[in-house]
């Protein structure tokens, strides 16, 4: 009888240990990953499938937060007036877009990231280490790359999103992002 009790205790302890190690493997500190996981779980419970619209909302929110953080750095460390003016435009336009997206997400029960994703935070950290012309150039390079991705993302959502509110948000925001991309490309030509 004692042997059975011991075997049961060892089996339970082994299962608990395995469950704990599984949680550590799947647990993430990446806010974007956590938001996507939460949305996937909600969508699976509601419909049995994942939703690309939720993924768009998470990517858009993360991109907006990145541009706000980088613009704050430019306010502190930027040298060129055209770069500072662009960053000020980023602050104004992306604050407005972020607020609108948060309102839509609240109505749709979409979980947005609470902070930057790990990859985006690396960009902020790398830029924060730079100064002078090197800082301005790196910021401009990041903004060109980021806005090229954003324009593609928002165009796809404006064309293909199932949710009418997210589709309208993407269509409404797309011209602003295209304007940003044109402007930052002009700055990029003049920065060398």
Language model features: what each stretch is:
Residues 2-9, 14-192:
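His/Met- and acidic-residue-enriched segments that coordinate or traffic transition-metal cofactors
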């Amino acid at each position: 009888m004692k042997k059975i009790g011991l075997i049961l205790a060892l089996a339970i302890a082994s299962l608990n240990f395995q469950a704990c190690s599984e949680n550590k493997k799947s647990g993430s500190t990446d806010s974007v990953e956590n938001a996507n996981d939460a949305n996937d779980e909600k969508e699976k419970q509601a419909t049995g499938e994942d939703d690309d619209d939720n993924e768009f909302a998470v990517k858009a929110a993360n991109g907006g937060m990145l541009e706000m953080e980088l613009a704050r750095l430019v306010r502190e460390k930027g040298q060129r007036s055209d770069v500072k003016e662009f960053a000020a435009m980023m602050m104004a336009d992306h604050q407005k877009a972020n607020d609108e997206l948060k309102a839509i997400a609240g109505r749709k029960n979409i979980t947005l990231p609470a902070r930057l994703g790990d990859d985006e935070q690396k960009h902020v950290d790398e830029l924060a280490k730079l100064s002078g012309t090197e800082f301005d150039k790196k910021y401009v390079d990041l903004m060109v790359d980021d806005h090229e991705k954003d324009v593609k993302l928002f165009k796809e959502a404006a064309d293909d999103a199932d949710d009418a509110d997210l589709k309208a948000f993407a269509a409404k925001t797309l011209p602003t992002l295209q304007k940003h991309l044109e402007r930052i490309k002009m700055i990029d030509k003049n920065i060398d």
